[in-house]
Amino acid sequence: MKSKIIYLIIYIGITLAFSACSDNTDFPDEPDTYENIAIVYWMGDNSLSGAAVRDIKELVQGKDKIPTNSKIIIYADTASAFPVIYQLDAKNGLKVWKKYTKEEDCTDSITLLNNLKTIVKNFPAKNYGLTFGAHGTGWSWRQRRALGPDDNDRSADKWLNVPTLRGVLQELPHFKYIFFDVCFMQSIEVAYELRNVTDWVVGSPAEIPGPGAPYNLITDALCEGDAYGIVEGYDSYYPNNRYKGVVLSAVNCNELENFTATTSTYIKTFFADRHTVSSTVAQNIQKYSSEFSSFTYCYDMNSIMPYILSNEEYQQWVEAFDKAVPLRKASSGKWTTSGHCNNPYIYDSEHFGGISMYIPQEGADGNAKNNELKHYQWYKDAGWNETGW
């Protein structure tokens, strides 16, 4: 457990870093209902604590872009302090809204639900957006871990998986967007699982740069629910002196069911009787991980399809794909990796899709992932349940 003394030191440090920050919660002329509330939920009780603090500083730097009658609400759990909820707007700057007096597991589903319900209750709004900061493993890795970890007791990392996240978010108002400033989260399995709780899913199918999004450049987009603005602002910041680039996309959830119906026809046909792509074909498909890393399920969805469809079929399919994933960005043609990919380049630029899809695989590791895929709605609705996989 963290001591109150450590908490006090960290709190004072953050307060000094953000000159506008105080624990005064008296705000004159607060509206009954806000136009926009952008929630940033930082799971930083791990090696990303410093990144969480830097991101809050960037949000403060961009506060003048926050529209009238809008706020950014930040929940931050870091390794050196108890969780804090901040509120940020253009007029008042950054203020502490709630200081926790004990540790909590920020990845626990009940904790997440209670924290988000508290924010929604106290900051009623017409529109909500939700951003996650964390480590990420996509849709599948060791018992379906996806977001986190929270390692406050230093004995075992605790993560939040995507089906559980979907269950939490179903209990809350519909979101304009969910933005994962997190590695590997932009997959069709994740986006489809969340299709009924948000209009847009924004994220990367690959690793993201260490600093993540340049929040000072996208504060207005976060508040306005502008998925395109989030992607464009993020992409515009990279590459820089240290980081090669970033891969991003925005998924229109309103198109996902039609897109999945189109895709399922081809999945059921090509992958019937446990058929799969050959190893030679797999080598040519755009990947966001190395062949033998823990992330071998990160194949670019648009890069897969030309290998399993005729030209005519592909043209019909890609028309639906372009509606579902209308924005894909990788301006530098490469991305920064910490070792999960030995070829971090967009080498199939013609079919760059900006979203990954799992291809079932044989072998022990493949069988584990194949079984985990069955926990996702994508497995049934995309037709995988009829292929023998």
Show the residue positions of the predicted features:
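Sec-dependent bacterial lipoprotein signal peptides
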Residues: 1-19
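Bacterial Sec-dependent N-terminal signal peptides
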Residues: 14-37, 359-361
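Terminal, contiguous helix-loop blocks that mediate binding/assembly
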Residues: 24, 31, 117, 122, ...
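Acidic/polar, low-complexity intrinsically disordered N-terminal segments immediately downstream
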Residues: 25-77
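Structural recognition of the beta-strand scaffold that forms the well-ordered cores
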Residues: 37-42, 71-76, 128-132, 176-180, ...
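Short alpha-helical segments and helix-capping/turn motifs at coil-helix boundaries
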Residues: 43-45, 51-62, 109-118, 187-188, ...
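Short, solvent-exposed loop/turn elements at domain surfaces
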Residues: 46-50, 82-83, 364-369
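Substrate-binding cleft of extracellular glycoside hydrolase catalytic domains
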Residues: 72-128, 132-134, 139-140, 144-157
